[in-house]
Amino acid sequence: MLFCDDSKKYLKEQNINLKNEFDKDDKRVEKFSLKHQNIYFDYSKNLINNYILKSLLESAEKSSLKDKIKQMFNGAKINSTEHRAVLHTALRDLSSTPLIVDGQDIRQEVTKEKQRVKELVEKVVSGRWRGFSGKKITDIVNIGIGGSDLGPKMVVRALQPYHCTDLKVHFVSNVDADSLLQALHVVDPETTLFIIASKSFSTEETLLNSISAREWLLDHYEDEKAVANHFVAISSKLDKVKEFGIDLEHCYKMWDWVGGRYSLWSSIGMSIAFAIGYDNFEKLLAGAYSVDKYFKETEFSKNIPVIMALLASYYSCTYNSQSQALLPYDERLCYFVDYLQQADMESNGKSVNIAGGTVNYQTGVVLWGGVGTNGQHAFHQLLHQGNIFIPVDFIAIATSHHNYDNHQQALLANCFAQSQALMFGQSYDMVYNELLKSGLNETQAKKLAAHKVIPGNRPSTTILLDELSPYSLGALIALYEHKIFVQGVLWDINSYDQWGVELGKKLGKNILKAMNDDSSDEYQNLDDSTRQLIAKVKNK
């Protein structure tokens, strides 16, 4: 693998000291920052210099990244294990140029489906869609899991100031009944519309929650016909949708060339449109499309997703980083980390290359984090004084939607202070002298100083948005989507399958059978540990 082999040979030997780099180059921020419209990307606090950046960019060229980008946007089946194109970008493409996949112009299909979703949203919002008893819909319950939940839920929360339809949107994902009950406790069966989001219409969690929601509805109405007024589906399995009782006119498409974790731009984003209105949903798509064009057309040295991917891959291959912290300093982005965990870790958590060979380098990392300033009082201690190498992405919003300017200034000051503290830290001498000034004697100061040293020289990137709007959020999400794609290219892995989740599903079905029948083959084939766990549950 060229990228990791090249980087490991010499880049760490540069021994970058961030304080020294800033001291000797007053143009460093200008050199190592980029802008796309209203998004400012400052990567000057990373362990790089001109030589390292040049080397990373050369590795990107060697990986045939330009060709891979063209292949993805043109509909080549880059998801090689499932023989599928990867075209979530087509869902937000505003051009009219035909895009042929398997003999069909998918642009026309996408346009038709968008219109269908728009009509449904407008029908429900206007009150023309009514519940079985004739009442107007007031609540939307989205039942889905993974990409059918994390993306829409994140966007609906992030864009709460743009909610404009008077519809309350709820999300149910976990097979734990508590997830469903939390929603059912606050909605009225006569004014609730359920969205079942499942391509196969057989995902265990989604199907079980949907069946229970259907039973809840029919307990109230006692009439099967009510289902058609209170359920719509997003699925490719029309027979199963019809059997459930949903009018096929209200079944919306999911295509094989859209992966679940990249599907919020599709009909899966219906719940978003119900919350913020279809016009704002289109602005979300437009923001992502602006990044798609920028990503395709911009040279690598000025291309934010490429630089993001190069930095992350550089730290993984050169510093053996196994973790990346994502710290959004905005409460509206409280679900952003959860969303990106799936997008990143399910995409790049692979240990074989595209040809099927075992890789001998590190690929995907653990992505984690949380909103500021909460994290400062929870896990930032590890970032500053722990002995684990953890690169950090800070996300900040320059202006807020509220009028509490003093809160916003404090929030931003804390964000910028954290990145500065990671970079500079505080030395033993600095701490020792401060302790003496505070009144401690020399013995006391020496004893305490070592505990207060913060090493610094820890890399971080700051992404600053002018505002958090549908357009800018769409752009931000797309930046990370393309970063994930570029990393997959650099590591020569398939970022668009997820075989690792299938075994657990299969075994889960077997264990469920075993729990209900200890004479079954499934039970007989269990290991002793699992049998004991089942026995403990049954004996309660």
Curated annotation (Swiss-Prot):
The active site is at E346, H377, K505. Its EC number is 5.3.1.9. Pathway: Carbohydrate biosynthesis; gluconeogenesis; Carbohydrate degradation; glycolysis; D-glyceraldehyde 3-phosphate and glycerone phosphate from D-glucose: step 2/4. It catalyses: alpha-D-glucose 6-phosphate = beta-D-fructose 6-phosphate. InterPro entries: G6P_Isomerase (IPR001672), G6P_Isomerase_C (IPR023096), Phosphoglucose_isomerase_CS (IPR018189), SIS_dom_sf (IPR046348), SIS_PGI_1 (IPR035476), SIS_PGI_2 (IPR035482). Keywords: Cytoplasm, Gluconeogenesis, Glycolysis, Isomerase. GO terms for biological process: gluconeogenesis; glucose 6-phosphate metabolic process; glycolytic process. Its main location: cytoplasm. GO terms for cellular component: cytosol. One of its GO terms (molecular function) is glucose-6-phosphate isomerase activity. It is found in: Cytoplasm. Pfam families: PGI (PF00342). Catalyzes the reversible isomerization of glucose-6-phosphate to fructose-6-phosphate. Belongs to the GPI family. HAMAP family: G6P_isomerase. This is Glucose-6-phosphate isomerase. The lineage of its organism: Bacteria, Pseudomonadati, Pseudomonadota, Gammaproteobacteria, Thiotrichales. The gene is pgi.
